[in-house]
């Protein structure tokens, strides 16, 4: 009797555990100045971001530092967020490659001066999986 009950419970709950639709990770910048949590809902294709002591915000709509042309591309568990930040003659192109299979985040910043590429910076964040 008890064995059948345990098998029934396992049969009901294991598919939900195995087919998890939400993924979460915590990432810290290489200089340890920025830290954020990232949560990805793969069924709704929604990426949420939360810094320490702040509320969850939709990362694909949220403007972090006067960004323009924010765009998110979803490819299974890999999300690429691109944006531009314009100054008078300069502008930045910022790309965030967030990978929930490897639990990694790579930030690529391209600095343009007078429409010419001046500098390219790659920041590899230290990320850790957070169990939900």
Language model: regions and residue ranges:
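Classical Sec-dependent N-terminal signal peptides that target proteins to the secretory pathway
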Residues: 1-21
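Short, solvent-exposed loop/hinge segments that bridge or flank secondary-structure elements
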Residues: 24-49, 79, 83-100
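Residue-level signal for mature regions of secreted extracellular proteins and peptides
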Residues: 20-21, 53, 65-66, 120
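N-terminal glycine/threonine-rich, aromatic-flanked beta-hairpin/loop signature
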Residues: 35-65, 103-115
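Disulfide-rich extracellular modules and peptides
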Residues: 29, 62, 74, 129-130
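Ser/Thr- and Asn-enriched, surface-exposed coil loops between beta-strands
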Residues: 43, 62-83
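Edge beta-strand at a domain terminus
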Residues: 111-132
């Amino acid at each position: 009797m008890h064995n059948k009950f345990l098998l029934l419970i396992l049969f009901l709950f294991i598919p939900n555990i195995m087919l998890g639709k939400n993924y979460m990770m915590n990432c810290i910048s290489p200089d340890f100045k920025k830290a954020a949590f990232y949560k990805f809902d793969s069924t709704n294709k929604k990426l949420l971001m939360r810094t320490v002591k702040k509320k969850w915000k939709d990362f694909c709509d949220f403007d972090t530092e006067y960004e323009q042309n924010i765009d998110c591309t979803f490819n299974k568990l890999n999300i690429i967020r691109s944006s531009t930040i314009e100054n008078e003659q300069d502008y930045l192109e910022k790309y965030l490659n967030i990978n929930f299979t490897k639990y990694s985040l790579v930030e690529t910043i391209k600095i343009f001066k007078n429409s010419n590429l001046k500098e390219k910076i790659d920041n590899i964040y230290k990320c850790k999986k957070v169990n939900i």
